[in-house]
Amino acid sequence: MLFYEFFRSSIGSRVSVMLKAGVYVSGRLGGIDPYLNLSLLDVRILSSHPGLSSISVCSIRGSSIKYILVDKDAKLLQGVNAGSRLRMILDKCY
């Protein structure tokens, strides 16, 4: 749930998504669910896929995502680091 909370707090910001199929997509994050399924608005396809050039809105299944790039936000990064450390400490205690 750590990454879900991170991306949920990034709704409305620009993200770039690399899919396992090799498609590179950029857009504004419109929504996300706990399975990391994404909804993107104002979509631009950054790789050479001519059939996808006219898409403006898309939904991406979480299991097809290779990685996601977001703008660096120091406050969010500190929250993710703190959450990761806390989870590691709790796992060692139990």
Swiss-Prot record:
GO terms for molecular function: RNA binding. One of its GO terms (biological process) is mRNA splicing, via spliceosome. Coiled coil: none annotated. Keywords: mRNA processing, mRNA splicing, Nucleus, Ribonucleoprotein, RNA-binding, Spliceosome. The keyword Lipid biosynthesis does not apply. One of its GO terms (cellular component) is P-body. Gene3D superfamilies: 2.30.30.100. Residues 2-74 form the Sm domain. InterPro entries: LSM_dom_sf, Sm, Sm_dom_euk/arc, U6_snRNA_Lsm2. It is found in: Nucleus. LSm subunits form a heteromer with a doughnut shape. Component of LSm protein complexes, which are involved in RNA processing and may function in a chaperone-like manner. LSM2 binds specifically to the 3'-terminal U-tract of U6 snRNA. Required for processing of pre-tRNAs, pre-rRNAs and U3 snoRNA. Belongs to the snRNP Sm proteins family. This is Probable U6 snRNA-associated Sm-like protein LSm2. It comes from Encephalitozoon cuniculi (strain GB-M1) (Microsporidian parasite).
